Amino acid sequence: NILGNTSNDWWLSSVKLEAGDTQTAFADTDYGSELEKCKRYTQVWQESGHEHMPWTGAQVSTTRSLVIMFFEKEMRAAPSITKTDADWQIWVRGTTGCDITSITFDQISTVSGRLDCTHGSGGGAGEAVIFAHDGSGSTGTLILSAEL
């Protein structure tokens, strides 16, 4: 008896309630389709090693770089960003990585944004850069949110 104990679990899924007496076909969507819909509202970028993000940019000076960030999917509105600064580096040709001390997110649209990064000294103005995790063993996270 499912109701015989308050600790019993009861699950119900794939049920569709409709008003009236006309039944329509049940449209069950797959996980991938639902995930793509969710990416219009939230996207999470998370790395846990010396891994490069898919974003590149250029140095403005020896301690500042601008990186273009393209989103996985167009978002429903220009998102806000939540980040952990200490876990990221800028990689410049000929260096092992410069620790980022601050990140500002600007020039935001529904498909991209710009990371304005202040970092340790390395390279020079005009050098190409790669945005990367610092490999410290912690997990760096960037969360884009275009919630309602």
Residue ranges and their predicted role:
Residues V44-L148:
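Phosphate/adenylate-binding glycine loop and adjacent helical scaffold
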Residues N1-H50, L144-E147:
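Extracellular polysaccharide-targeting segments
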